[in-house]
A protein has these predicted regions:
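Active-site proximal beta-strand in glycosyltransferases
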Residues: 2-9, 100-117, 145, 158-161
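A conserved mid-protein helix/loop that constitutes part of the nucleotide-sugar donor-binding site
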Residues: 25, 181, 188-204, 220
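Membrane-proximal helix-turn-helix segments that form the acceptor-binding/catalytic region
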Residues: 29-32, 102, 125-144
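A structural motif in glycosyltransferase catalytic domains
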Residues: 34, 183, 198-201, 210
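A short, active-site helix/loop in glycosyltransferases that binds the activated sugar's phosphate group
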Residues: 46, 131-173
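An aromatic- and histidine-rich active-site surface loop
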Residues: 84-104, 109-116, 151-154
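Glycosyltransferase donor-sugar binding loop
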Residues: 186, 209-222, 229-235
Length: 240
């Protein structure tokens, strides 16, 4: 019998025809992959906006506010033989980690990116201070894992190597004589993702072009460069 694994996320999840959808591909692939070894229960924030990727799990719950979310965290903590995984540090997941600690449970926190840089991009100078406060406390009461050593900032933790590149991406390799560099970015167009910095770096570079896949319907990207092509989200990866 599989052990239960509760995954807590700050990501928004929409519901349509009893199916659950998210924008962040990691929130789809990580729980689905772990579900092969655990009985995964995914918890997240409810979104009224339709999201892109269907999460193929049987046990998903979404919440309108932090109070109902924490109430379910309390219920989950009663499963004594279960594991608890928190994806990324945000105000929501920060409170969840503290709440689990008060309930006598020690979660695993998975850090996928540098929160210091992301919060600086979002909040300015105060951003790194705000993230440092959450990171310091969370790191002291949790077991950390990350995809990069520098993200841990010297704290003890495990390093893993996740990748979305599977056999579909690698099925037809070619040897090319590269004269012009063609870059591909697949993801959300957000300042904290660094995409605007990349656009500025290649501005006026005639030998470099960038294709961005991830534009949201009805929302301006704010990027207008001749060497950048912006396309809407593509669900089927074989179409890339």
């Amino acid at each position: 019998m599989k052990k239960k694994l509760f995954i807590f996320s700050n990501e928004s999840i929409s519901i349509e025809d009893n199916k659950y959808y998210c924008d962040n591909l990691d929130l789809k692939s990580t729980p689905e992959g772990l579900n092969k070894k655990f009985e995964v229960n995914l918890l997240g924030r409810k979104s009224l906006k339709k999201r892109s990727h269907e999460i193929k799990l049987k046990r998903i719950k979404v919440f309108n506010n932090i109070f109902s979310y924490l109430s379910e965290v309390k219920n989950a903590s009663k499963n004594l033989d279960s594991k608890f995984l928190i994806i990324s540090i945000s105000p929501y997941t920060f409170l969840i980690s503290i709440f689990l600690k008060t309930l006598g449970r020690k979660p695993i926190v998975y850090l996928r990116s540098d929160g210091y840089g992301e919060y600086k991009a979002i909040l300015g100078k105060i951003g790194p201070l705000f993230y440092h406060f959450m990171f310091s406390i969370t790191g002291a009461i949790s077991n950390l894992i990350s995809c990069r050593d520098y993200i841990l900032r010297g704290k003890k933790g495990k390093i893993i190597g996740p990748s979305q590149l599977d056999s579909v991406w690698l099925r037809q390799p070619k040897n090319l004589d590269i004269k012009n560099f063609k870059l591909l970015y697949v993801g959300r167009i957000r300042v904290e993702k660094g995409i605007f910095s990349l656009a500025e770096l290649i501005k006026n570079k005639r030998d470099i072009s960038l294709t961005i896949i991830g534009a949201e319907k009805g929302r301006s990207s704010g990027i207008n460069q001749s060497n950048i092509k912006i396309l809407p989200r593509i669900i089927n990866k074989t179409k890339f």
